[in-house]
Structures are given as C-alpha cells and as structure tokens.
Design a protein with these regions (language model features):
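Sec-dependent signal peptide recognition
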Residues: 1-9
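A residue-level marker of the well-folded mature domains of exported/periplasmic proteins
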Residues: 17-218
Length: 218
C-alpha cells in the first residue's frame, strides 16, 4: 500500500497544482492551503479495505505538509447508493481529489462524471471502472491496481494442480457486475479450461462472507 500511496499522491498533487485556484468558495478544500484528498472505499467492515485505509492514513501522517486526507466508505459492499452519496458529499465538500475503490464498475460512473465536471481529480483503484461506460461519459479516469485476471489464473493453476483431471469445479464470485469480479472469474475459468476440468456451478456471494458461507454449505 505504501508504494501505491506514493504513486497516487504524486499524480494527484501534480494535477491539483495545475488546477485553477481562483475560486473564493469556502469549502473544505479551499479552507486549507494544501489539497484535500478523499479516499472513498468499499466496505470498511472488510479487513482488506481497512488495511488499505490504514496505509493511506499512515502515508498522510508522514507527509502531512503535502496534503490532507479524508477517509470514508460503505459498510456493505452491495450498498451502491450509499457510495454514490459519499461521492456527491465529497463534491459538495469541495475536495481537490477523489481516490475511489468503486463497489460497482458501472453504477459509480455517473457520480464520478459529476466530480470531474466539478474540477475534481478522480483516481480509480482496486476495482476498475468499466471502460465502455467511461467512454459513454467521455471520461478518462486513471486506474491503479493489479491484474485480477492474471492473479486469478495463478491461483487457479495452484489450486487445481492437486485435483484429478475429471474434477468438477464450483466458482463463488463477488458482485457479478464488478469488473474485478469478472476478471477474477475469467482468469480462474482459463485455469479450469487449461486443466481440462469443468465448471458445474457459478454463484455470486456479493462479497458477503455470510452469504458466501451459506452458499458453500448448501
């Protein structure tokens, strides 16, 4: 997370410095001499995203002279409306930048289009926004994150090597419309095909551990 934080902040600061600062609005971002960056996460009940938020806060604490940081997120990863509301709140607050891990690759694009129209720098992390939807809104939002497809392929190769050639495989994915979920499913299916095995069921757990456990034990 440290390397990602440095990259994100470098991109944001360079962009924000070139923005027009002639506005006399009394918003959050204008009240400070340094840019205000909003980190909009998925579920902060998920340890993975809590660790990401902690890493960002640690970086800001070490570089407090460069920027301010506002961290927020949703509790349930399927609560897309709440994450849209958070983006709109950040727009109203007048932040200079929004770094977002979108809960959905499509549903967040209209809200982020409003942010860009307001002159806010937007950076996409973790779950990539759907390129086709971005094109519809004439948006170019940079993405910083891993290749979920390659990662899932590697995981599949490792897991399947211990199974018989005629094994049947079940896939339990996250939110079906999320880009990272699609990429992970695709990568794992490639591993299954390469191992000459068959996927017999595909179900969505919506990134919910309780739901995933219920589906697995059913």
């Amino acid at each position: 997370m440290k390397i990602i934080s440095i990259t994100l902040v470098s991109v944001i600061l360079l962009t924000a410095c070139g923005a027009d600062d002639s506005s006399d609005s009394s918003t959050l971002g204008d009240a400070a001499a340094k840019p205000m960056i909003a980190l909009v996460m998925k579920s902060l009940a998920n340890e993975f995203f809590v660790n990401m938020a902690n890493g960002a806060e640690a970086h800001q604490a070490e570089h407090g002279e460069q920027y301010e940081l506002l961290v927020n997120g949703i509790r349930n990863e399927s609560d897309l409306a709440q994450q849209v509301n958070l983006v709109d709140q950040m727009i109203s607050s007048g932040v200079q930048a929004i770094v977002i891990a979108p809960a959905d690759s499509r549903a967040l694009v209209p809200a982020l289009a409003r942010a860009v129209a307001a002159g806010i720098v937007v950076i996409n992390i973790d779950n990539r926004l759907e390129p086709e939807i971005l094109e519809e809104y004439n948006l170019q939002i940079p993405f910083i994150g891993p290749s979920n497809r390659e990662g899932a392929k590697l995981v599949g190769d490792y897991v399947l090597q211990g199974l018989d050639d005629d094994s049947e495989v079940a896939i339990l994915e996250g939110i079906s419309s999320a880009f990272n979920s699609i990429q992970r499913r695709t990568g794992f299916e490639e591993a299954v095909a390469q191992a000459n095995m068959q996927v017999v069921t595909l179900q969505s757990g919506d990134w919910d551990q309780t739901k995933a456990a219920q589906l697995t034990s059913a």
